[in-house]
């Protein structure tokens, strides 16, 4: 797909005004966010050129691998965590903060996110539907007990006894959707309902190429929602969007907030 990168100065002010007006008058507005929202926080994209999956084999993080070789799965997961975060401590950027501001001002009802970084929560957004889970927790595969991931990962990194285990004896795993696993029904059902009921649907920083999340803007558009796509690259949903803003999300979203 073409990569037509523009700055905020290349976006027609009338388009920004139109998006702001749509949000101002909407009864229900929803945002779907992808990796492009978090790259400005220093988190690399998983897909695309030089993405994480270009350097790490996704098969190493498949559900089958966890079942067959939990120690190897965890060793590779520690390596993946280092590749993603290294020495950085990611913080919310202007895009996360703008979405939180839209919600606080009553112009956004929920954020549906494909990201697992927890930065929408950190920015102060109250209603976040984490479609792929979150790396900030681990969950016991047997009893479902959840713990803070940072503590467990630090203990695992300092131990030769992998995988980390719950008090019940079950194996802890990242509280994310692994390859080979379906998206949680509760999260997906809520996301579909919000998309269907929305008057405005913002698709922000997502290639809209990964199902089933990529179906959400389609559901919204079919329900007569005003679809707005904010992404550097073309997406499969551009043709059905009322507005396509091909510019930096950390510039576009604050510019919309300023107009409200």
UniProtKB/Swiss-Prot annotation:
Protein's recorded name: NAD-dependent protein deacetylase
InterPro entries per the UniProt record, alphabetical: DHS-like_NAD/FAD-binding_dom, NAD-dep_sirtuin_deacylases, Sirtuin, Sirtuin_cat_small_dom_sf, Sirtuin_class_U, Ssirtuin_cat_dom
Domain annotation Deacetylase sirtuin-type: ranges: 9-260
PANTHER family in alphabetical order: NAD-DEPENDENT PROTEIN DEACETYLASE, NAD-DEPENDENT PROTEIN DEACYLASE SIRTUIN-5, MITOCHONDRIAL-RELATED
Main location: cytoplasm
Family membership noted in the UniProt record: Belongs to the sirtuin family. Class U subfamily.
SUPFAM superfamilies (alphabetical): DHS-like NAD/FAD-binding domain (SSF52467)
Catalysed reactions, as listed in the record: N(6)-acetyl-L-lysyl-[protein] + NAD(+) + H2O = 2''-O-acetyl-ADP-D-ribose + nicotinamide + L-lysyl-[protein]
Gene Ontology MF: a single term: histone deacetylase activity, NAD-dependent
Cofactor(s), names only, from the UniProt record: Zn(2+)
Function: NAD-dependent protein deacetylase which modulates the activities of several enzymes which are inactive in their acetylated form. Deacetylates the N-terminal lysine residue of Alba, the major archaeal chromatin protein and that, in turn, increases Alba's DNA binding affinity, thereby repressing transcription.
Protein source organism: Haloarcula marismortui (strain ATCC 43049 / DSM 3752 / JCM 8966 / VKM B-1809) (Halobacterium marismortui)
Active site positions, chain numbering: 132
Cellular compartments annotated: Cytoplasm
Entry-linked Pfam families: SIR2
Keywords (A to Z) from UniProt: Cytoplasm, Metal-binding, NAD, Transcription, Transcription regulation, Transferase, Zinc
Residues binding NAD(+), per UniProt: 35, 39, 46-47, 114, 116-117, 132, 206-207, 231, 248-249
Entry note: cofactor: Binds 1 zinc ion per subunit.
């Amino acid at each position: 797909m073409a990569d037509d990168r523009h700055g905020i100065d290349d976006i027609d002010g009338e388009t920004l005004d139109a998006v702001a007006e749509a949000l101002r008058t909407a009864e229900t507005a929803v945002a779907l966010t992808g990796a492009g929202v978090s790259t400005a926080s220093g988190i690399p994209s998983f897909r695309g050129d030089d993405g994480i999956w270009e350097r790490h084999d996704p098969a190493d993080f498949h559900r089958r691998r966890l079942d067959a070789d939990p120690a190897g799965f965890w060793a590779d997961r520690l390596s993946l965590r280092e590749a993603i975060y290294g020495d950085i401590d990611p913080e919310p950027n202007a895009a996360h903060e703008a979405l939180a501001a839209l919600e606080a001002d009553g112009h956004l009802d929920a954020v549906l996110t494909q990201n697992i970084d927890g930065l929408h929560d950190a920015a102060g957004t109250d209603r976040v539907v984490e479609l792929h889970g979150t790396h900030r927790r681990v969950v016991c595969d047997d009893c479902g007990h959840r713990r803070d991931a940072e503590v467990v990962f630090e203990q695992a990194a300092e131990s030769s006894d992998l995988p980390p285990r719950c008090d019940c004896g079950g194996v802890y795993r990242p509280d994310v959707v692994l390859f080979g696993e379906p998206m949680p029904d509760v999260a997906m059902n809520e996301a579909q309902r919000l998309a269907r009921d929305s008057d405005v649907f913002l698709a922000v920083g997502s290639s809209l190429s990964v199902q089933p999340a990529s179906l959400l803007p389609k559901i919204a558009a079919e329900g007569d929602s005003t679809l707005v796509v904010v992404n550097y690259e073309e997406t499969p949903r551009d043709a059905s969007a009322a507005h396509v803003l091909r510019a930096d999300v950390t510039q576009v979203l604050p510019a919309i907030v300023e107009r409200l």
